């Protein structure tokens, strides 16, 4: 067996090594010259996931640092509360910025809680540097960063990354500092953008109209998160603008996430009939039955996934049964309260495309796991 491994072609070894964690990859390079050569193969590095769980020198020895040139798509994970982890993440991003022409995709993810009053200036500064240098960047996903994102970042991406296809800024920060004017500049600078994630307050009627312009590339996904005080006060996006956008891009899907900060009147402003809602997440402190019934009336043709976090009630159960009867294309339903058996029966009977559901008939220990439909 040892001889077989020793005689494997470099291309085969590279396919084996590409899924190794970075630290294990560094160990493999010390086995023999053939393994070291395979570990430096571009196949290993083209699409890379890196978890920053130690100092950079232990994670990425100097003799492997040149391999960063091969990275096209990177998923970088770190723990903001651990100094070595965030230091390594910052150094890696800074190193990428200095050799970024090949970078096509960047996704950042935080594990654990961030320290109190941590604004993430080190990480965000490195992201700014990447945006200023990675002129061929296609995909930037910052949904899992816990920091407040602002106009500076959006304008840096607009100026430095004209080839962007997707940009997700709809993170879980408590404050939204991205103004609608910055989003307009981004859309003007990035004509090929196909997917965009924002807080609702960052969106405007002018942005919807620009996305509907004849010269735009097909637009596929708009994810809007409504979770900040700014979102609750945001100007309404008129139904006629949504209708025009849907007509211009028939395949457009909208994801709406409504959080407890929204009063009932704000929810009424946000839920417009012409919005092509494919994913709806309701985690409201007020009325939930009304939005579920609104979705039944207006989103039956487009709704693919519904998530409800609310207290159980006969009215909610009835609304869910009515939705099941109308939304035949539904693929996921997740309700985080105990439901009566007829709710489960309704979704099983009327939704033939259902792939997973969370519909519990009695209380269970958390976290509740979805049931997969085979």
From Swiss-Prot:
Keywords in UniProt for this one?
Answer: Ubl conjugation pathway
PROSITE patterns given in the database record? FBOX
- Alphabetical list of InterPro entries matching this protein: F-box-like_dom_sf, F-box_dom, LRR_dom_sf
Concerning Pfam families, the annotation shows: F-box-like
Q: Does the keyword Nuclease apply?
A: no
Look up the domain of life of the source. Eukaryota
In this chain the F-box domain maps to 2-48
Annotated tissue distribution: Widely expressed during embryogenesis and in adult tissues.
Q: Describe its function.
A: Substrate-recognition component of the SCF (SKP1-CUL1-F-box protein)-type E3 ubiquitin ligase complex.
Its subunit composition reads: Directly interacts with SKP1 and CUL1.
Record protein name field: F-box/LRR-repeat protein 8
Gene assigned in the entry: Fbxl8
């Amino acid at each position: 067996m040892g001889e077989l491994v020793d005689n494997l072609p470099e291309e085969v070894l590279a396919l084996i090594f590409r899924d190794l964690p970075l630290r294990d990859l560094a160990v493999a390079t010390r086995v023999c010259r053939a393994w070291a050569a395979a570990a430096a193969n571009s196949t290993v590095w083209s699409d890379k996931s890196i978890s920053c769980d130690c100092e950079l020198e232990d994670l990425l020895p100097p003799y492997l640092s040149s391999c960063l040139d091969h990275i096209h798509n990177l998923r970088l994970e770190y723990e903001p509360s651990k100094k070595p982890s965030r230091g390594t993440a910052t150094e890696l991003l800074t190193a990428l910025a200095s050799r970024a022409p090949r970078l096509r995709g960047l996704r950042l993810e935080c594990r654990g809680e961030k320290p109190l009053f941590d604004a993430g200036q080190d990480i965000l500064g490195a992201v700014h540097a990447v945006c200023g240098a990675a002129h061929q960047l296609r995909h930037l996903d910052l949904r899992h960063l816990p920091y407040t994102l602002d106009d500076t970042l959006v304008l840096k991406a607009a100026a430095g990354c004209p080839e962007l296809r997707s940009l997700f800024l709809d993170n879980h920060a408590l404050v939204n500092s991205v103004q609608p004017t910055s989003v307009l500049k981004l859309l003007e600078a990035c004509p090929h953008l196909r997917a965009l994630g924002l807080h609702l307050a960052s969106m405007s009627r002018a942005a919807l109209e620009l996305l509907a312009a004849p010269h735009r590339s097909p637009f596929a996904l708009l994810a809007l998160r409504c979770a900040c005080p700014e979102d609750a006060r945001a100007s309404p996006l008129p139904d006629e603008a949504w209708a025009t956008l849907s007509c211009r891009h028939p395949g457009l899907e909208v994801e709406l996430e409504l959080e407890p900060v929204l009063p009932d009147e704000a929810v009424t402003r946000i839920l417009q009939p012409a919005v092509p809602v494919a994913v709806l997440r309701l985690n409201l402190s007020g009325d939930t039955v009304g939005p579920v019934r609104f979705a039944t009336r207006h989103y039956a043709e487009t709704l693919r996934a519904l998530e409800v976090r609310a207290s159980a009630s006969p009215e909610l159960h009835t609304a869910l049964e009515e939705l099941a009867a109308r939304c035949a294309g539904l693929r996921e339903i997740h309700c985080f309260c105990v439901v009566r058996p007829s709710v489960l029966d309704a979704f099983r009977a009327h939704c033939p495309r259902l792939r997973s559901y969370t519909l519990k008939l009695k209380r269970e220990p958390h976290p509740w796991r979805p049931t997969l439909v085979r």
